[in-house]
Amino acid sequence: MDSARREPAAETGRAPAAPFACHAFPRRSAGVLLHPTALPGEGPVGSLGAEARRFVDVIAAAGFSWWQVCPLGPTGYGDSPYQALSVFAGNPYLLDLADLGARKLLTPEEIAALRRGSDGRTDYGRLWNQLRPALQVAARRGAKILKQNAAFLRFREQQAGWLGAWCRFSALREANGFTAPDKWTIDEAPAEA
């Protein structure tokens, strides 16, 4: 029998196989691929905060079972999620500004300065230059609280295998003007790192 030709069911005595039968997936499901930065919201990009929770509710109501995201690490030179600087660290762009405001780590005025442009587009260069200093302010304000926060201390202990190295790398990267590591001239992390 020609492999490209199927015999009619009447000739074989059995029903033809479904063209895409797959026994590895016992039930059908659907999902969506969308990076959280593409979610609509008040911030400069979508976050893993309220926008993400609303999105999950919407896709669940539509019958979707899966939300696949691109890598969520801190992006490097070009802001591609596929060129993340770490497989463990999170992308600071995905922090929920409203949550930082609710925790009194950023003021309403500081958050308003970071809002998305009126045309809905994101300028990642502007975002980097504005968000990074704002997050440093939030980190300074929250430092005392975090040093006494059991969940944070547990996280630090559990993630010690990569967290210290990431902090040193980040401090060196900043000290070297955010250039590529092969261009670095400073090889000692600043003391405040």
Q: Where would I find each of the regions flagged by the language model?
A:
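N-terminal carbohydrate-binding accessory modules
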Residues: 4-27
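Acidic/aromatic-lined carbohydrate-recognition and catalytic surfaces
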Residues: 19-20, 25-193
